[in-house]
């Protein structure tokens, strides 16, 4: 019997910096203990046209922070007339998480975006922050890293990064019981945020 204290979980997420943008990818499964609770969970969240975060961990905690970050980004733009930078968003998130460390949010985040260039940060539940060229988080991260470590190059184009990100998530899905039920892929370039449709994703993977 499930206990009410068990948490709804999100699992494997991946981020890749390419020469022309950032790719974020995630599986769509959420589990409650050992039970698959949902099969179409959104784990990548648009903050504005050039910023997004991907979360692995407690779904409620992630969505709460997404709402706060969207509000802060809008307020920053209203007050300054400028978009928040990727680093500023990641630092804000890190400060929120560090401030709650006595009763922590149960989530690990990837913050990706494009300001002067594509950038990617990982932020852990204690507020530790690192800028990365590629990163994986969640229960299937070790399987995703086996792909990222062997396939990543700094001169990757977004189209190539999409294929590697999908391969990394698929590796996790095949081996991690808490990952599965499809893949969501988002790109963030100078032109802005774009979520790939299933048909578009399939077309890219066939090339």
Curated annotation (Swiss-Prot):
It catalyses: Cleavage of peptide bonds with very broad specificity. Residues 1-10 form a propeptide. Keywords: Autocatalytic cleavage, Cytoplasm, Hydrolase, Protease, Proteasome, Threonine protease, Zymogen. Its EC number is 3.4.25.1. One of its GO terms (cellular component) is proteasome core complex, beta-subunit complex. The active site is at residue 11. Its main location: cytoplasm. CDD domains: proteasome_beta_archeal (cd03764). It comes from the Archaea. It is found in: Cytoplasm. GO terms for biological process: proteasomal protein catabolic process. Transmembrane segments: none annotated. It is an enzyme of class 3 (hydrolase). Component of the proteasome core, a large protease complex with broad specificity involved in protein degradation. Belongs to the peptidase T1B family. PANTHER family: ATP-DEPENDENT PROTEASE SUBUNIT HSLV, METALLOPROTEASE TLDD. This is Proteasome subunit beta 2. The lineage of its organism: Archaea, Methanobacteriati, Methanobacteriota, Thermococci, Thermococcales.
